[in-house]
């Protein structure tokens, strides 16, 4: 379980997050949404251990987070892949740094590449891939070390609508298969409502938890209902419009 208690953090000498309290259980998909400047990415960087926080605590499985660790896998918006390595070697890179024996890490990489639908592309270089394929590689690399927690920082933002829908579907299927804790940062309201088992709305200046919304649309999808059916459901549309209104309220209040 991820547990964040009374978290305060600064960014560039200014308060970025104030009194953040969140929990994320195994098998849950927590989505964090809010207007620009609300501290979404700062929160993810704190959980990943990339930057320090000033007060409060962040614990994963009862252990405090003080820096990066293999128990947390991160998928970045710009993928963060190595262009001089092929798909297989990018996926295996973290395992190589961890000292995993070559044959073992290549076998794990092969399984992860297959899991994200890129089987047969192992020897292709990153510059030969589409945006959606690169994000699949990023997800495979993050999962290769079998982390307890998967963190994703607006990973679909640069993708076209069709590809974004494909990668959303892939992520939900992987979430169901692995049972991992997943935390997703996004600015896309429909994406947030569709994918979250709990949606956290942040307000800006500094970032605070405005509202927490338990949702079941992601569970309906992994149970077999189509995304088109879910997104045309009046309940989904009503929730999307409610969340949109809340985000606009915050943006207007702090503009």
Swiss-Prot record:
Its EC number is 7.6.2.7. It catalyses: taurine(out) + ATP + H2O = taurine(in) + ADP + phosphate + H(+). Belongs to the ABC transporter superfamily. Taurine importer (TC 3.A.1.17.1) family. The complex is composed of two ATP-binding proteins (TauB), two transmembrane proteins (TauC) and a solute-binding protein (TauA). One of its GO terms (molecular function) is ATP hydrolysis activity. It is a peripheral membrane protein. GO terms for cellular component: plasma membrane. This is Taurine import ATP-binding protein TauB. Keywords: ATP-binding, Cell inner membrane, Cell membrane, Membrane, Nucleotide-binding, Translocase, Transport. InterPro entries: AAA+_ATPase, ABC_transporter-like_ATP-bd, ABC_transporter-like_CS, ABC_transporter_ATP-bind, P-loop_NTPase. NCBIfam families: PRK11248.1. Residues 2-229 form the ABC transporter domain. Part of the ABC transporter complex TauABC involved in taurine import. Responsible for energy coupling to the transport system. It is found in: Cell inner membrane. SUPFAM superfamilies: P-loop containing nucleoside triphosphate hydrolases. ATP binds at residues 34-41. SMART domains: AAA.
């Amino acid at each position: 379980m991820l547990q964040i208690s009374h978290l305060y953090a600064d960014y560039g000498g200014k308060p970025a997050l104030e009194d953040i309290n969140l929990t994320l259980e195994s098998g849950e998909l927590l989505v964090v949404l809010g207007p620009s400047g609300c501290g979404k990415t700062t929160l993810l960087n704190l959980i990943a251990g990339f930057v320090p926080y000033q007060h409060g605590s962040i614990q994963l499985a009862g252990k405090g987070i003080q820096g990066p660790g293999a128990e947390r896998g991160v998928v970045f918006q710009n993928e963060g892949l190595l262009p001089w390595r092929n798909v297989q070697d990018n996926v295996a890179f973290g395992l190589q740094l961890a000292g995993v024996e070559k044959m073992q890490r290549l076998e794990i990489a092969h399984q992860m590449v297959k899991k994200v639908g890129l089987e047969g592309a192992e020897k292709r270089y990153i510059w030969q891939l589409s945006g959606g394929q690169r994000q699949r590689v990023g997800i495979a690399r993050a999962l290769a070390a079998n982390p307890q927690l998967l963190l994703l920082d607006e990973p679909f933002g640069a993708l076209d609508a069709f590809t974004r829908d494909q990668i959303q579907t892939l992520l939900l299927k992987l979430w169901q298969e692995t049972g991992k804790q997943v935390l997703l940062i996004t600015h896309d309201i429909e994406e947030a409502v569709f994918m979250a088992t709990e949606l956290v709305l942040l307000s800006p200046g500094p970032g605070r938890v405005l509202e927490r919304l338990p949702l079941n649309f992601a569970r309906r999808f992994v149970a077999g209902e189509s995304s088109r059916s879910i997104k045309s459901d009046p309940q989904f549309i009503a929730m999307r419009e409610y969340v949109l209104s809340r985000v606009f309220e915050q943006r207007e209040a702090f503009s």
